[in-house]
Amino acid sequence: MDMRVPAQLLGLLLLWLPGVRFDIQMTQSPSFLSASVGDRVSIICWASEGISSNLAWYLQKPGKSPKLFLYDAKDLHPGVSSRFSGRGSGTDFTLTIISLKPEDFAAYYCKQDFSYP
């Protein structure tokens, strides 16, 4: 049985999905942040177009994979400290960490979950 026809048909259907965009760009600031234990820090994330609250935050420690810790812009993953908080909707989002602890020092990334390539 030749499976190429259904795959081609699926490709055509995907081209006709109305209102679906796959080119949302994300920008974070600052790109580097110097902080000390006990500090309060904020990281801002912007989307090139509205993504509602479809934003997740990940942290990555050296030699480890990124780890989801906040989703839907403000909801903490189970077990994540309430020292972390997120807010925002549309195009502007903020991650805030209060009372920094040594284990908080990592790379932080925002990721939109509104559309996929």
UniProtKB/Swiss-Prot annotation:
One of its GO terms (cellular component) is immunoglobulin complex. Residues 23-117 form the Ig-like domain. Residues 111-117 are annotated as: Complementarity-determining-3. Disulfide bonds join C45-C110. The keyword Membrane applies. Immunoglobulins are composed of two identical heavy chains and two identical light chains; disulfide-linked. Coiled coil: none annotated. It is found in: Secreted; Cell membrane. The keyword Transcription regulation does not apply. Residues 79-110 are annotated as: Framework-3. Keywords: Adaptive immunity, Cell membrane, Disulfide bond, Immunity, Immunoglobulin, Immunoglobulin domain, Membrane, Secreted, Signal. Residues 72-78 are annotated as: Complementarity-determining-2. Residues 46-56 are annotated as: Complementarity-determining-1. PANTHER family: IMMUNOGLOBULIN LIGHT CHAIN (PTHR23267). InterPro entries: Ig-like_dom, Ig-like_dom_sf, Ig-like_fold, Ig_V-set, IgV_Light_Chain. This is Probable non-functional immunoglobulin kappa variable 1D-42. It comes from Homo sapiens (Human). Probable non-functional open reading frame (ORF) of V region of the variable domain of immunoglobulin light chains. Non-functional ORF generally cannot participate in the synthesis of a productive immunoglobulin chain due to altered V-(D)-J or switch recombination and/or splicing site (at mRNA level) and/or conserved amino acid change (protein level). Immunoglobulins, also known as antibodies, are membrane-bound or secreted glycoproteins produced by B lymphocytes. GO terms for biological process: adaptive immune response; immune response. Residues 23-45 are annotated as: Framework-1. Its main location: secreted. Residues 1-22 form the signal peptide. Residues 57-71 are annotated as: Framework-2.
